[in-house]
From Swiss-Prot:
Phosphotyrosine modification, residue list: Y74, Y88, Y89
Keywords on record: Cell cycle, Cytoplasm, Endosome, Nucleus, Phosphoprotein, Protein kinase inhibitor, Ubl conjugation
Residue span of motif Nuclear localization signal: 153-169
UniProt protein name: Cyclin-dependent kinase inhibitor 1B
Organism, as annotated: Canis lupus familiaris (Dog)
Polar residues composition bias: residue spans: 1-12, 104-113, 175-186
Post-translational modification: Phosphorylated; phosphorylation occurs on serine, threonine and tyrosine residues. Phosphorylation on Ser-10 is the major site of phosphorylation in resting cells, takes place at the G(0)-G(1) phase and leads to protein stability. Phosphorylation on other sites is greatly enhanced by mitogens, growth factors, cMYC and in certain cancer cell lines. The phosphorylated form found in the cytoplasm is inactivate. Phosphorylation on Thr-198 is required for interaction with 14-3-3 proteins. Phosphorylation on Thr-187, by CDK1 and CDK2 leads to protein ubiquitination and proteasomal degradation.
Gene: CDKN1B
Modified sites of kind Phosphothreonine: T157, T170, T187, T198
Gene Ontology MF: a single term: protein-folding chaperone binding
Subunit note: Forms a ternary complex composed of CCNE1, CDK2 and CDKN1B. Interacts directly with CCNE1; the interaction is inhibited by CDK2-dependent phosphorylation on Thr-187. Interacts with COPS5, subunit of the COP9 signalosome complex; the interaction leads to CDKN1B degradation. Interacts with NUP50; the interaction leads to nuclear import and degradation of phosphorylated CDKN1B. Interacts with CCND1 and SNX6.
Length: 198
């Protein structure tokens, strides 16, 4: 290490140690503009929200707080729910990390589901809303955390031995012809492209 050349711009280890002892390093989280005045911040936010509401009210001549049209350049008409595309009135999707708890679904120890959620037109009926599911029994909320951890995409296997990526098969099992003996499925290989030698 005696042949290592240290550039003149970098401080020696003695100077670095002395600097660290004199000036303790401040925390990485610093307040650059002084203490936060939460009351002023709240007032500014409320004022900004009111300004945005007024701007959108003037732009669209619609009172968004009371859900009523106003006089102006746009003419608002009430439209029936059935004449709109489905995405305007369907319930919003839960976030990706959220737990899905379908109604009346039970699960056994191995992780297999007993009843699944409604699919297709059954799930999109007008009577089915997220609000209705929330107003069910309050004791269903207690099992929510337990169900979130218990639901699996794949059922648990009964076999405790690890699965091999490639199954070992003997010629006896293959030639046996019985369905149980050679039940392991093998992926066919792609035929290699062979060049003609001329």
């Amino acid at each position: 290490m005696s042949n290592v050349r240290v550039s003149n711009g970098s401080p020696t280890s003695e100077r670095r140690d002395a600097k660290q002892a004199e000036y303790p390093k401040p925390s990485a989280c610093r307040n650059l503009f002084g203490p936060v005045n939460h009351e002023e911040l709240t007032r500014d936010l409320e004022k900004h929200c009111i300004d945005m509401e007024e701007a959108s009210q003037n732009k669209w001549n619609f009172d968004f707080q009371n859900h009523k049209p106003l006089e102006g350049k746009y003419e608002w008409q009430e439209v029936e729910k059935g004449s709109l595309p489905e995405f305007y009135y369907r319930p919003p999707r839960p976030p990706k990390g959220a737990c899905k708890v379908p109604a009346q679904e039970s699960q056994d120890v191995s992780g297999t589901r007993q009843a699944g959620p409604l699919l297709g037109s059954q799930a999109n009926s007008e009577d089915t809303h997220l609000v209705d599911q929330k107003t069910d029994a309050p004791d269903s909320q207690t099992g929510l955390a337990e169900q979130c951890t218990g639901i699996r995409k794949r059922p648990a296997t009964d076999d405790s031995s690890p699965q091999n990526k490639r199954a070992n098969r003997t010629e006896e099992n293959v030639s046996d012809g019985s369905p149980n003996a050679g039940s392991v499925e093998q992926t066919p290989k792609k035929p290699g492209l062979r060049r003609r030698q001329t």
